[in-house]
From Swiss-Prot:
Protein name: Alanine--tRNA ligase
GO process terms (BP): alanyl-tRNA aminoacylation
Compartment list: Cytoplasm
PROSITE patterns tied to this protein: AA_TRNA_LIGASE_II_ALA
Entry cofactors: Zn(2+)
Function: Catalyzes the attachment of alanine to tRNA(Ala) in a two-step reaction: alanine is first activated by ATP to form Ala-AMP and then transferred to the acceptor end of tRNA(Ala). Also edits incorrectly charged Ser-tRNA(Ala) and Gly-tRNA(Ala) via its editing domain.
Family per similarity comment: Belongs to the class-II aminoacyl-tRNA synthetase family.
Keywords, ordered alphabetically: Aminoacyl-tRNA synthetase, ATP-binding, Cytoplasm, Ligase, Metal-binding, Nucleotide-binding, Protein biosynthesis, RNA-binding, tRNA-binding, Zinc
Cofactor, free-text remark: Binds 1 zinc ion per subunit.
Tagged with keyword Glycoprotein: no
Amino acid sequence: MRYMTSEEIREAFLKFFEKKGHKILPSASLIPDDPQLLFTVAGMVPFKPIFWGKVEPVYTRVATCQKCLRTVDIENVGKTPRHHTFFEMLGNFSFGDYFKEEAIEWAWEFLTQVLGVPEEKLWVSVYEEDEEAFRIWNEKIGLPEKKILRMGKEDNFWGPAGPTGPCGPDTEIFYDTGYSKGCPEGEECTPANSEGRFVEIWNLVFTEYYQDEEGKLHPLPRKNIDTGAGLERFCAMMQGVYSNFDTDLFQPIINRIEELTGVGYKTDEEKDVSIRVIADHIRAITFLISEGVFPSNEGRGYVLRRIIRRAMRHGILLGMSEPFLYRIVDAVVEKMGKVYPEIVRGEGMVKEVLSAEENRFLKTLEQGMKVFDEIVEKKGKIDSEDAFRLYDTYGLPLELTLEIAKEKGVEVDVQEFNKYMEEQQRKSRAAMGDVEFARRYEYLEKLPKDFRTEFTGYEKLEDEGEVVLIARDDETVEEASEGTVEVVFSRTPFYAEKGGQVSDTGMVEWRDGKALVEYVFEASEGVIVQRIKILDGTLRRGQKVVLRVDKKRRESTMRNHTATHLLHAALKKVLGDHVRQAGSLVAPDRLRFDFTHFKGLSSAEIEQVEDLVNEWIMEAIPVEVRYTSYEEAVKSGVVALFTEKYGDVVRVVEVPGVSKELCGGTHVKNTGQIGLFKIISEESVSSGVRRIEAVTGFSALELLRNQKKLIDQLKEILGAREDELTDRVLSLREKVKELEKKLSQGRISEKMIAMKQLEDGVKVFHGVFEGVEAKHLGGIADNVLKKEGEGIVILFSKFENKVFLVVKVSENLLDRYDASSIARNIAKELGGSGGGRKNFAQAGGRHPERIKDVLERLEEFLR
């Protein structure tokens, strides 16, 4: 076998299958268009709707190199030669086209003729009942029977993913590395009896059955092929190395880690594990952040945070005490950027998000580890409540807690941890409100097969349609004469909530009745459901109706949607290309846009963005809409949000010279129809994500009117011209502060301040106050000494769960008493620190509840 680089292998695979009539498609996003999955875990994920029979394929033969991410075995990453979080899966797929014979023959041809793998190095396994696959391998390929292993369902039968669904036998191809560890003495080594010698390099799944509720298998009318081969394993095979980490996919990254840490690879096994963990995790981190996933405490963001913090901890084991992961990103981009340009575009963003997260974790890790050690010292174990507190309060992922505990030989009880986690998630969901997509809409099964609602809302706001289905409380009904029901019409001009844009509202009318359309949504692909409230008459299945969209509401929404595209473009121009959409809301009264950026916008930047958007509005640029393939759209430079499916015809909305995005929403005909754009707020949403809210058109006009009314009221109240308002308000604020200070000091001075006389006759005046700022306590102490003439004054103030104190000693007592020493003594008792001069000192503490004890032992602290 000749040495082949990862680039050569990737290209050879795709070219081979292109010659076999396959459509070569780009990798889909790591973020799947599938609510059941957090990440794309296999090459077939983008094609699930096709495998499940929900969508007709555009191409019957497809080949891809798919980005994938799995964390199910994350604790093994770094400890084995082949476990990874991020990996690339090569795959060829057939949707009702070729089947077993071609799939097996082409896999063999690619391995032996294109890659040049010696036949004697290859073994296969088949499902024990799959005689057809056995025959193809034995008779067509000519593989000896002893090299075809018959395996059970656990090893060689795929699916279904749930209790029911598509499934089928598979055949696996193994490569013999020659590594002899684990082979039984006196027996020939095979993939079934050796440990580590044979590596599974390719899995060919023959999806030919459907499993029903009783577990019975039924032949599928259309049989499919789904194959997957790990690029990393192909590289190890073709580059003559045993470990994937020794391939050209990882070596440049490992070299960079060696430079940064000063630790050589393959010098110490424990350190090698840490280097491999970092090399693996930095790839996952780079790709996830570049696709808009940011560290958080739930969902994908939590997985990313786990990966970052695990990599950081292994960096600490290598002696790193400062952020370093962000400095490895360029090695990943240099190696993989040509194949995946999204990481080139997002490099700056990845580094900034990662650097911020590293700094945040380093601040909490020290505190978290201190608490960890305290718990272990006290209990000898970490129970579920402790583990959850370390996660929730100190940011230590459970997996990290488990890993550290294992290293320290400490028992961890995690049985109840998930209950704490589920309760937190339940509260989070409750706070978010009812989530529409959580429903199953089983009543849609009553629709005709392959039914799709005809959407006409791009061209018109009024249309005729027919009632296809009526549902109440998730059950279909033939008619409805009152209350709220969900209805599917044959066609509709009503836009369903999607892509951040809220749904249309309006009216439905028929011969003897009418209903209010309250909400519209797409319950499954292509099926639009309208939630309506019947106002008059009886609505029946088959009824002819007229559907009228609320024109003013739709037009306001259109203004805001096009303005959102302009805002996105303006932010990129003002802040940089790292800006990516991270969420949006397009409503009739306002727009909200979440985007990636790492600090708040200055007033000047906000003005720049506003000016740009309003310039484009005043130019009245025509808004163009066209349909094209996803590939062509991406080639033309369109902004994509990683949610489009393979093969789909996509809708491109373009403002020439300004913006070009994939979008299914409704838009104005030209930018001039937006009228006016005004930002009303800019704030942080989470680490690395900012949010802008803005208004357009009549909402912007209303905002300006209200601001004018407010200014007029202030002018009248303050008796000032508009250009004098700022100075007048600042002057009043200073006067109020001064009056509050005098009032506070005057009132407090009049309060009863306790006095205690020491054995030497010295009087100690003390008092405890609520909410008095530290800067005012000194003035109060001055007032007390002025009134009393001499003595020691010790004053406390409880303020926001903390305590402040001042100590003042009159001049005649300075030879015997030191205010600085007294303040330090008391502060130590209160869990804080302090100091100052001999005659005046200040201090603070974290335990205001200990003040009473201090006063009872006051003389101790004066020594």
